[in-house]
């Protein structure tokens, strides 16, 4: 059976295994596992590697993970592998093992930790952490010094005084090439003091060409994207002598051809949205309409201007270029569409949930349903987790039609928005149309308050009329009794006593007025009870959502605090379990 290699080329250990197989002409099938799409957590891949990490291989009946173990196995199992990669000499093998063990506890935490906390954090939904980056940089600098003065001592081209590369050379070089995503000045600041290290990286690259550059092509493209984003961020902060090019439908024209060309180039460039930006956009959409609105004719264009202002004023995005309101609207439309579709898939998976299945298992089933239905991967899990418990979002985008098979038609939501429901896809969900044309609704509190005031005024008016009518009837009744007393003959005591014993019967108008008052009192009491219950339910739902979010944030902060404390200690101060925990936390961050 042909060897299968499960890898993601943005992963340093994955690149080492792929280059090794290609250089030694080992026939294999490469199966891509995209970490950004959480494919490593799928049930199919966890059957191969229960830890859910890449790389992993399947060779016949053997399923193996951990890049160092994979490289050792391939070197021993395949005759085409040249001896210098993993020598048969036991003393040389032992020294290679010592380098590999040192790599996992020194160079990898330093290099990976610095890149994560200074560049790649936002791409993974984590904030940049200058303090953690500084601590990782100290470990990286120390590791580079050890590499330069101990492992590369002498005039040899490779580690341990060898003139040919080993699996240790390949593994460590792939680790350091991850620094390519840094700014050029930052990378040179770290590597330039270590000339032996720079020459050794180049020697390993040449020894494994052309496969080295081919496997690293994904990383080089990521480097170019990071560099362009840094250039855009610099261009968005003009100095006192620079010229600002205005981008608007009514902007001023420029006679300078260079400015016109620069404007065209900047318009062509499209900056991708990070998870952190998505989180701020969702927060802006959820919170903006809660502000006081003084006019019922509040158009959607003004609404998106306010969302754009909310987004651009966020402190966590201060170092990034500003987004236009139209950009926010386009991103929200795309994000909302995909999340709505995934909700339908998740509901379907939830209905088919069997006993023993966890929430992660249900998510994986929903992910597979989405992939099968829409022929693409669902990459917005972070947005789905933010919106799924939002009362406002759920009320505006109901999902009763997501499982139906009715005809394709437009319907109306509670707020009057037009939606489109298609029968061609049983998992289709309603999507709001014509956002620019619709008039924004007033906040729920304002409308309900106005309706309540109108109802109270109506009830008070009815009660006042009934009270006035009852008062007039009582006055007429008293006058009638006085007239009867005046007309009675004197001395007729027996008749007078008989009439006093008989209670006066209410008129039809009195009975109707009393019944009306009773019904109104009952209706008003029932209405107040319903409002109290609804308000109580709303508060409980909000508290529960906040509690869940706080728990998740607390878990994340706890893991980061544990990792920071472990990174602040030297290897000699860590027990074996603490060392394993530190490496596991670093891998989770990446």
Curated annotation (Swiss-Prot):
Keywords: Detoxification, Nucleus, Transferase. The keyword Membrane does not apply. Residues 89-232 form the GST C-terminal domain. GO terms for molecular function: glutathione transferase activity. PROSITE patterns: GST_CTER, GST_NTER, MYB_LIKE. It catalyses: RX + glutathione = an S-substituted glutathione + a halide anion + H(+). Signal peptide: none annotated. Its EC number is 2.5.1.18. Belongs to the GST superfamily. Theta family. May be involved in the conjugation of reduced glutathione to a wide number of exogenous and endogenous hydrophobic electrophiles and have a detoxification role against certain herbicides. This is Glutathione S-transferase T3. The lineage of its organism: Eukaryota, Viridiplantae, Streptophyta, Embryophyta, Tracheophyta. The gene is GSTT3.
């Amino acid at each position: 059976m042909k060897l299968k290699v499960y890898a993601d080329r943005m992963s340093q250990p994955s690149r080492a295994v792929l280059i090794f197989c290609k250089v030694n002409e080992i026939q294999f099938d490469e199966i891509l596992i995209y970490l950004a799409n959480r494919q490593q957590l799928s049930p199919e891949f966890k059957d191969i590697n229960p830890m859910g990490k890449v790389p992993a291989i399947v060779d016949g009946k053997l399923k193996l993970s951990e890049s160092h173990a994979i490289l050792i196995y391939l070197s021993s199992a395949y005759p085409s592998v040249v001896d210098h990669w993993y020598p048969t000499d036991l003393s040389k093998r032992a020294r290679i093992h010592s380098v590999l063990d040192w790599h996992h506890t020194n160079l990898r935490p330093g290099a990976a930790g610095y890149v994560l906390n200074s560049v790649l954090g936002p791409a993974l939904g984590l904030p940049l952490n200058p303090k953690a980056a500084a601590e990782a940089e100290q470990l990286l600098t120390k590791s580079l010094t050890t590499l330069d003065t101990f492992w590369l001592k002498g005039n040899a081209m490779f580690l341990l005084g060898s003139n040919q590369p080993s699996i240790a050379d390949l593994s460590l070089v792939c680790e350091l090439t991850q620094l390519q995503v840094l700014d050029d000045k930052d990378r040179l600041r770290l590597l330039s003091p270590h000339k032996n290290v720079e020459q050794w990286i180049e020697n390993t690259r040449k020894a494994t060409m052309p496969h080295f550059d081919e496997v690293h092509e994904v990383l080089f493209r990521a480097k170019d994207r990071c560099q362009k984003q840094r250039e855009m961020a610099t261009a968005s902060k003009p100095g006192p002598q620079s010229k600002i090019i205005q981008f608007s439908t009514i902007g001023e024209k420029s006679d300078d051809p260079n400015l016109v060309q620069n404007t065209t180039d900047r318009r062509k460039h499209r900056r991708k949205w990070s998870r952190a930006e998505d989180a701020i956009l969702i927060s802006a959409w959820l919170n903006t309409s809660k502000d006081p609105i003084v006019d019922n004719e509040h158009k959607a264009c003004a609404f998106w201007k306010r969302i754009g202002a909310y987004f651009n004023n966020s402190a966590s995005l201060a170092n990034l270029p500003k987004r236009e309101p139209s950009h926010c609207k386009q991103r929200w439309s795309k994000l909302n569409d995909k999340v709505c579709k995934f909700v339908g898939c998740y509901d379907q998976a939830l209905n088919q949930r069997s006993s023993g299945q966890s929430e992660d298992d249900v998510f994986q089933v929903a992910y597979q349903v989405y992939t099968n239905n829409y022929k693409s991967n669902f990459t917005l899990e972070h947005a789905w987790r933010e919106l799924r418990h939002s009362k406002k979002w759920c009320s505006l985008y109901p999902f009763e039609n997501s499982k139906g098979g009715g005809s394709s038609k437009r319907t109306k939501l509670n707020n009057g928005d037009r939606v489109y429901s298609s029968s061609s896809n049983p998992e289709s969900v309603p999507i709001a149309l014509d956002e620019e044309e619709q008039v924004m609704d007033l906040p729920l509190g304002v409308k309900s308050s106005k309706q309540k005031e109108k109802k109270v005024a109506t009830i008070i008016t009815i009660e006042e009329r009934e009270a006035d009518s009852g008062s007039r009837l009582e006055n007429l009744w008293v006058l009638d009794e006085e007239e009867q007393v005046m007309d009675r003959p004197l001395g007729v005591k027996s008749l007078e006593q008989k009439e006093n014993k008989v209670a006066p019967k209410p008129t039809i108008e009195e009975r109707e007025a009393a019944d009306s008052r009773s019904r109104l009192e009952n209706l008003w009491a029932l209405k107040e009870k319903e409002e109290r219950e609804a308000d109580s339910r709303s508060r409980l739902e909000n508290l529960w959502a906040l509690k869940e979010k706080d728990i998740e944030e607390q878990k994340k902060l706890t893991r980061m605090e544990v990792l920071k404390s472990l990174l602040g200690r030297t290897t000699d101060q860590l027990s074996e379990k603490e060392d394993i925990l530190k490496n596991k936390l670093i891998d989770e961050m990446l």
